[in-house]
């Protein structure tokens, strides 16, 4: 709402002045806090088109679903996350007064009023209601309320609502997420397709999507979704997921759907058909003439019934149905026998296969005794036979099932009561809890010795060493590891969380719905192509599609994870796929939580989800892929670091640093070929097909969504370029703008109206020779003050030089302002600084990859010839090596003469 619409809304609600001021303050204020995920919560931000800002959520299954509902609810005018906190007071379970500041999840403005909303699961509310009965209460109607919050809201004539996950329909929410690319975005649809679909639906109302696509060859799933989003077709979004084409029914309008649905319900209720085929199943308990019978077989011609005692009988099915329809035979209500049935069920569940086999043998003999087949039980002792018959009849009379009376009772024999002294046993348990299960991680032998000393001091008999270790083994493994070694060590034994309720799929319903991004340091040592010098291990950035497990982007660099790696990963993704993911799953790394990164995701309507720290199972898709990359590719190359993981067994013959032959460019070439071709076409056990096949089929089912394609052009590249922490720079007359200690100039700065004004700025972290400024409604290219020195230099190299200068000034106790000339002079003498030289070598290796990515239109970048810059740098490297490291005698390697491994020919 704009200011005029807000005033009209306040006038309609007849709000008091202080209430209007409060709402205005909430509307103008940023979120009062930044959400953080707890141990099992996935938090993140959602780019709201309705609000024009990003909305935070602390739970991706409750709060995020609520955001989706409010985003598409026409009754919701505005909603704000994390509004300003207010103080609440209540009593806890012990009756103690508690007061603290509380921040609700949302403040929502609707057509009929405004309210604070707190969203939680029912299970969580039940626990909180026991702990804080004065704060959360469950009403008789099943609704939850918060009296302290309501008391605060009543002061302003507003409401405070406690909302639960029970109000969220998983299927409806899932369909909203599925249609998010079509809601609010323009999409092209020809009139011929619209007319053909509507005409066919009028003739065949309620047809499924699968049947419609099979009949109309010129219509695809993408067209159907566009018509649903634009309300040209009606689908009950709360019925079934849209991706299930064989179940999703289409209608011309909601009125048409309601009319056919009502007619079908009436026809079913009025149709006089016997209900027996759907209600009568084998082992169904029936009541006939006050006697209990069991339905053994319900056949087409005859039906077999078994009485409580006696022999089974057979009735013609037609006659049986007449008795059933007339009510003479009816289904037995087992409510009164719930206790008996529960006892029988417990006895049957606890019986072992050996016991069941023995009971079956006894049952056959007892049945032969009832039927007077003496030849079957003639070898059985008469006294034993009478005992079995008695056990059968007693169980039949008391439990209604004589079979359980024949189950062996050998497991109940013997004295099962504990024989150890109570004092000794309790003291042993105490020592295990207080001395063994502690972060001290004391050994079992030392704890047992302390236990024996304590028993001697108390003059009681200690339990044996064997009993002590048996008690240790019976303790829960997860809890014991948690107390001794901490949460990370115990995470491996933590039980899995199984989704048993109807929920959204954890890996999405379509390709590019959920994409994981993460970094890892590859287990391989690399050399410089120019000098043969060891450069260390590279960092790998991967983006993978959770739905199809397809690798979407691969990026290699020597730099530690930063926003530069994130930017390049997203650039490669858009270059190869032409799409931006709907949801990006990240970890807690600081490179994923910068303002620049969040702005980039919001710009392309991407929801960011943050995995809980120390819980790798939340990112199992990409964590497993890192392991696959190592085992299937990296570990087959020379210079892999498997041997160095056991340093005590490392020798020169297997030292990865001695065996290293790969350079960054060659490794990237073959790594992309493996990721985009080999892995992509291999069979995946979890999918039952290859990632490429699943990805392609997923696009055909979920729609290509061509209207959401992103062009890999200068506009996109500019959006991926970072800005400074301030975001703006002042145009200094004659100098231009200053970015990262450097001045940049453009002829656009000659305009007097631009001088001494703040303009938005961006820069290329891989080329500090240029920067960009937003002047007169367009981005202009600016040249560095010392362009010849800084062109091709990365941001990290310049910042490293600045750090070196600060360190030198600190040692000499001098204070020198960092400026472009000082930095240029310092970098020009790079041969005297090995740290800068190594960074330069790494940056030049990475520069080759960037040139390939920007110049090649193919998916698999190729390795170009070495530039002349490497020859100059090789001479500098030899000088540095001879001056600083004379003992190494590293000779340049001619990698072009090295043999290529057979598997990559």
Residue ranges and their predicted role:
Residues 1-68, 72-115, 119-156, 160-171, ...:
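Secondary-structure boundary/capping micro-motif
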Residues 175:
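Conserved tryptophan-centered aromatic signature that marks the ligand-binding surface of SH3
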